[in-house]
């Protein structure tokens, strides 16, 4: 969980997520929504690597 937050903060600091950075300054509630979306996106990225066994020829 901490790694996700630090990743989000890193993205904001590097300017990769300008929209998120503007949301961060508005309200903590939206911050939770942003973190939740980041977690979903990261889990979404991890799905292909875990399901790659289905596409393997073995």
Curated annotation (Swiss-Prot):
Protein known as: Leucine zipper protein 6
Tissue: Widely expressed, highest levels found in brain, placenta, spleen, testis, and ovary. Up-regulated in some tumor cells.
Induction section of the entry: By IFNA1.
Note: Elicits IgG antibody response in a subset of polycythemia vera patients and as well in patients with chronic myelogenous leukemia and prostate cancer receiving IFNA1 or other therapy, suggesting that it is broadly immunogenic. This protein is produced by a bicistronic gene which also produces the MTPN protein from a non-overlapping reading frame. LUZP6 belongs to a group of cryptic antigens without conventional genomic structure. It is encoded by a cryptic open reading frame located in the 3'-untranslated region of MTPN that is expressed following IRES-mediated alternative initiation of translation at a AUU start codon.
Organism of origin: Homo sapiens (Human)
């Amino acid at each position: 969980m901490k790694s996700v937050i630090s990743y989000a903060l890193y993205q904001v600091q590097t300017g990769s997520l300008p929209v998120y950075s503007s949301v961060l300054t508005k309200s903590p509630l939206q911050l939770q929504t942003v973190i939740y979306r980041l977690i979903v996106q990261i889990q979404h990225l991890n799905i292909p690597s875990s399901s790659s066994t289905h596409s393997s020829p073995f």
